[in-house]
């Protein structure tokens, strides 16, 4: 369980947080440069990263539900007073991203941005459900850790800069591959 948790935390903090700005950058490259970059391949890579992340997250939820001795907490959250947030979390984190198995949806930038936003919202609903049910059950706010964040504006700047850099790297990779294919055929 710790391995799954570590993998999802690494993906969430290092890659997934920057998907929305990265997808916007890919969309801008698609609009501004028409057929210059292989944006469909980049979108396909992003889609499969989202699908793999969703499968790992789903396995983590299933493992927690079946094998952890506190599995009652999962069913209690799904049927308790904050059930709406739990089901929003499942919809955003597990159900909606699996629609990317359909190629027609996978190649639409707007839909990918929507799915990325829904997944990020699902992650926040997950934290909300865990913290609020803990406070509701224990009536003790000391048990919930409060995270210190950077100022909001700097945080947003970092997200967009790193998202744009990731998009440029991804598009550059496909551009270099295309150049090597052309060079090897001549």
Tell where the protein language model's regions lie, with residue ranges.
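Long, contiguous internal "core" modules enriched in hydrophobic/ aromatic residues
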Residues: 1-74, 79, 86
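Hydrophobic cores of alpha-helical transmembrane segments in multi-pass inner/ER membrane proteins
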Residues: 14-28, 88-100, 157-177
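Membrane-interface capping segments at transmembrane-helix boundaries
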Residues: 31-35, 171-186
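Membrane-helix interface motif
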Residues: 62-71, 126-140
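Membrane-interface transmembrane-helix boundary segments in multi-pass integral membrane proteins
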Residues: 73-89, 141-169
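Membrane-helix interface "capping/anchor" motifs
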Residues: 100-113
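Central hydrophobic cores of alpha-helical transmembrane segments
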Residues: 110-123
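Transmembrane-helix bundle segments that line or gate the permeation/cavity pathway
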Residues: 123-134, 174-180
């Amino acid at each position: 369980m710790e391995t799954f948790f570590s993998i999802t935390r690494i993906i969430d903090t290092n890659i997934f947080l920057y998907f929305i700005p990265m997808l916007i950058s890919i969309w801008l490259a698609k609009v501004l440069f028409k057929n210059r970059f292989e944006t469909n391949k980049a979108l396909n890579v992003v889609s499969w990263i989202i699908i793999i992340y969703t499968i790992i997250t789903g396995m983590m939820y299933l493992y927690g539900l079946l094998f952890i001795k506190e599995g009652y907490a999962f069913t209690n959250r799904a049927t308790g007073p904050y059930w709406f947030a739990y089901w929003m979390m499942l919809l955003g984190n597990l159900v909606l991203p699996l629609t990317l198995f359909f190629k027609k949806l996978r190649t639409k930038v707007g839909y990918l941005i929507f799915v990325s936003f829904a997944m990020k919202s699902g992650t926040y609903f997950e934290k909300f459900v865990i913290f609020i049910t803990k406070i509701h059950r224990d009536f003790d706010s000391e048990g919930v850790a409060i995270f210190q964040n950077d100022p909001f504006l700097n945080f947003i700047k970092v997200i967009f800069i790193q998202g744009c850099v990731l998009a440029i790297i991804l598009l550059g990779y496909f551009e270099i591959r295309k150049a090597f294919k052309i060079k090897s055929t001549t």
